[in-house]
Design a protein with these regions (language model features):
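Surface-exposed, charge/polar-rich loops and edge strands
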Residues: 1-6, 10-11, 25-156
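Short hydrophobic beta-strand that contains or immediately precedes a catalytic carboxylate
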Residues: 13-16
């Protein structure tokens, strides 16, 4: 199920599983099961976005890690742009680079960490090498603050 917030004008706002929603959309799936996390239909648009942001129900950053204005957030899943560092972080987690965590948008936090350490060109042109580099960084003391970090606790 895809978690959503009910917002102004009875719109459903996806707050997680965006990649799944995008993939289903591209496959032509017309209906999906959702779970309603909160009903904010009664608030005005400005308050709605502020609540989503403060509750960490949104990640208003683009594929380069720059914060977007609320008005620039895609209006549908078809407008979502792939962040190659989010893809790298997802694969890193799948391979054991870090543990699944309940922290909202934890893979985006890892993506931002990796974005500062690995060249985008490497991620886009040699994903396997970028992944190996990401695995090394994921086990480092530099990453200790990130959710799901499972690197060595000591420097042996």
């Amino acid at each position: 199920m895809i978690p959503v917030i009910l917002g102004p004008n009875d719109c459903h706002y996806i707050i997680d599983h965006h990649h799944l929603a995008r993939a289903l959309h591209e496959e032509g799936v017309k209906e999906v099961l959702v779970t309603i996390v909160a009903n904010l239909r009664m608030v005005d648009c400005d308050t709605f976005w502020t609540v989503l942001d403060n509750r960490r129900w949104m990640h208003p950053f683009d594929d380069k890690g720059h914060r977007r204005k609320y008005k620039d957030i895609p209006k549908s899943v078809s407008g979502l742009v792939d962040d190659p560092f989010r893809s790298l972080a997802g694969e890193l987690r799948r391979l054991g680079g870090f543990a699944k965590d309940t922290t909202p948008f934890s893979e985006f936090l890892w993506a931002d960490f990796l974005r500062l350490r690995i060249k985008r060109k490497l991620v886009e042109h040699d994903f396997d090498r970028a992944l190996a580099t990401a695995m090394e960084f994921s086990k480092s003391q530099e990453a200790i603050y990130l959710p799901g970090w499972c690197g060595p606790a000591s420097q042996d």
